[in-house]
Regions:
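Conserved, mostly hydrophobic/aromatic
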Residues: 12, 43, 53, 69, ...
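Active-site groove signature of glycoside hydrolases
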Residues: 104, 168-194, 277, 281
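Active-site-proximal helices and loops of the catalytic beta/alpha 8
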Residues: 86, 90-92, 116, 177, ...
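Active-site clefts of carbohydrate-active enzymes
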Residues: 270-292
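Long, intrinsically disordered low-complexity tandem-repeat segments
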Residues: 517, 538-575
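Substrate-binding/active-site clefts of carbohydrate-active enzymes
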Residues: 1-9, 13-49, 56-178, 200-206, ...
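Carbohydrate-interacting/catalytic domains
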Residues: 1-52, 58, 88, 319-483, ...
Length: 637
């Protein structure tokens, strides 16, 4: 049981939260990081025990164009500030992971500056991809190079160069030695070279017990990254999209299908892949903005904290703040905030109280961290599932309807369950419990009485946390609901029941399910699952308007010397020159391949290995990133 298995993360984008300038003048350090010290207490108060913070290191602008991996960004302070901050986190029981931006660097990075000065004679010319001294760019460098995202201010590192790999591995060792960091979130992990990531995993295993590697992966088969030899976890963008759209559309089938598919990727692990779950971050719109019905904040967050995976809350979202993604700027997603503005949030902000309650409940329950997942009930508007360990069962019930709903769900051999948010106690009858789930709310039912935690950290009653849904809770309900009964509770009218049944039957028909079944059938309900908003769904091989990176040319990232340059483990005798030559030829062919050809190659290999479902086929066509597809096809070997 590693620390990250029971982690509840808080996510801070420090340049935004501290109000740092958007451009770095490389002047004297301004000690803004110290202003985040009071946030450590807040992080603990809302039930978090881990912090993902970044980017942190010297950069040109938004933090992802690193110029010095071993120096805190001068807009935030100096290295002593960062040491003190991590130490304070540890003293308060908060683990810390940094943002590791290793796919690309900024133009002021020392090695790139050397290439600009010494050109062909630079010792670092092979540190970057496809450097062409016959080309040019908008900076009039007199040469061209591969960039990231179409921006020449982001210079793509050649991760297959042993010197680059060794340098980055040394950076990780430095971060642990200097700052005592507990893990790293790998930026753009879905296009990082697999051999490079395996080298990072080797360093992670070496530098510190339970050092955690989590990667940013937008889509695809997460098991390609999450395994014993590569990363511990990746960002769960599939669930992120399902959580908000499943509530906006009143379609719990989408969420349940996504959960079932992702949980199945975990193989024999009862707790699944332990993906990094979130409802918003520094790249996507705030959940409070995304939700059509703000009352859905409650059931969305109940699911975030109880489904398989590691939950995370993005700074400010616990207050219910809004943030809409703009066409040419993410500034509205990364605002400066002051805790003084929210000093009474735990008393009068329903979003904050619910978030805090869920964080503490999550940490109190082993079942929510380690339990298996079993779906118990599913309609368009209601959803129930259990998380089970040998010693504890948690049953989670959510309702996205504007009316209360009475659920009867199986509960195994347990006799009594305790509502952690409402304080209710219900007794089992013939292996089932009957519970009332209030409108636009959720509840977590646990079997262990000694873990009972009635949710309001401020000392009031908790039922309003999941019924009001808004941010102002002055008129919240007082007093507990009656225990073990539905007397006096609002239930649906006959007309409402008929409406919901008709809607449910239509969904089941669309999903290929027989009426009256609670589980997913063989149909393709999940075919309606879309990509996150950061991606346009691609139903064809043209990439839906994406600029393809290097889709018709060699990357120029050949590994110098006689080291291997394939993104996979070499099979057979490493000294077999003919074998290596064949592998290099295949690599070059893949890297020159176009999007459509790479997709068809992946599908052909998958079909050779077994049956390919419509969902698997759609996953391939949804991936329209050249580098990601190249890594995918190499991962089969």
């Amino acid at each position: 049981m590693a620390w990250y298995d029971e982690a509840v993360f808080y996510h801070i984008y420090p340049l935004g939260l501290t109000g740092a300038p958007t451009e770095n003048t490389y002047g004297e350090p301004v000690h803004r990081l110290n202003t985040l010290l009071p946030w450590i207490t807040h992080i603990r108060e809302i039930g978090c025990n881990a912090l993902y913070i970044g980017p942190l290191f010297e950069s040109v602008g938004h933090g992802y164009e690193t110029t010095d991996y071993k120096k805190l960004d001068s807009r935030l302070g100096d290295n002593e500030d960062l040491k003190a901050f991590v130490k304070a986190c540890h003293e308060n029981g908060v683990r810390v992971i940094f943002d590791g931006v290793f796919n690309h660097v900024g133009r002021d990075f020392f090695a790139f500056q050397d290439v600009k000065t010494n050109r062909e004679n630079s010792a670092y010319k092979d540190w970057f991809c496809n450097v062409n001294f016959w080309g040019n760019n908008e900076y009039n460098d007199g040469f061209s190079y591969d960039n990231w995202g179409g921006y020449n201010l982001l210079v793509k590192l050649n991760q297959r160069n042993p010197a680059v790999r060794d340098y980055i591995c040394d950076v990780i060792r430095f971060w642990v030695r200097e700052f005592d960091v507990d893990g790293i979130r790998l930026d753009a992990a879905d296009v990082l070279d697999f051999e490079f990531m395996r080298a990072l995993r080797g360093v992670a295993n070496e530098v510190k017990p339970e050092f955690w590697l989590m990667g940013e992966v937008i889509h695809g088969d997460y098991t390609r990254w999450v395994n014993e030899g590569t990363l511990h976890s990746v960002t769960n963008y599939h669930l992120h999209k399902a959580l908000y759209s499943g509530h906006n559309d009143h379609n719990y089938f989408e969420i349940a299908h996504t959960v079932t598919r992702l949980y199945g990727m975990g193989g024999n692990r009862p707790d699944g892949l332990k993906l990094y779950n979130f409802v918003d971050n520094h790249d996507v719109e705030r959940i409070y903005t995304k939700l059509n019905n703000k009352a859905h904040y409650a059931p969305v967050h109940v699911l975030l904290y109880t489904l398989p995976g590691v939950p995370s809350v993005y700074y400010g979202s616990e207050f219910g703040i809004e943030g809409k993604k703009e066409k040419f700027s993410d500034a509205s997603l990364r605002p400066a905030l002051s805790l003084d503005e929210y000093k009474d949030a735990l008393n009068n902000n329903a979003c904050t109280k619910l978030t805090a309650a869920l964080g503490h409940i999550r940490q109190a329950s082993k079942a929510l961290s380690y339990g298996d997942y079993q779906q118990l009930l599913l309609t368009n508007r209601q959803y129930a599932f259990s998380r089970n360990t040998q010693d504890e069962t948690a049953i989670v019930t959510v309702n996205n309807d504007d009316s209360d709903y009475v659920m009867t769900v199986p509960c195994g051999n347990h006799t009594v369950f305790y509502g952690m948010l409402t304080g209710q106690e219900v007794s089992a009858v013939n292996g089932t419990i009957c519970v009332n789930v209030k409108a636009n709310s959720g509840e977590i039912w646990l079997t262990n009485a000694d873990k009972l935690f009635v949710a309001d950290p401020a000392g009031g009653e908790a039922s309003a946390l999941v019924t009001d849904g808004g941010k102002d809770d002055a008129q919240g309900q007082q007093g507990k609901t009656e225990q073990g009964t539905t007397d006096g509770m609002k239930v649906k009218t006959e007309a409402e029941e008929e409406r919901d049944q008709a809607e449910t039957d239509r969904t089941r028909q669309n999903c290929g399910m027989e009426a009256g079944t609670g589980g997913m059938g063989a149909g393709s309900c999940g075919d309606r699952t879309e990509l996150p908003e950061t991606c346009t769904e691609a139903g064809n091989t043209k990439g839906a308007g994406y600029e393809q990176q290097g889709n018709a040319k060699d990357t120029g990232c050949e590994q110098p010397g006689n080291a291997k340059g394939a993104g996979y483990e070499q099979q057979g005798n490493a000294n077999d020159e003919a074998h290596e030559a064949m592998d290099r030829a295949l690599d070059e062919a893949f890297e020159r391949g176009k999007i459509a050809g790479l997709q068809e190659a992946i599908l052909a290999i998958m079909e050779r290995n077994g049956n390919v479902t419509d969902r698997m086929r759609q996953d391939v066509y949804d991936n329209v990133y050249h580098d990601s597809l190249v890594n995918w096809v190499k991962s089969f070997r």
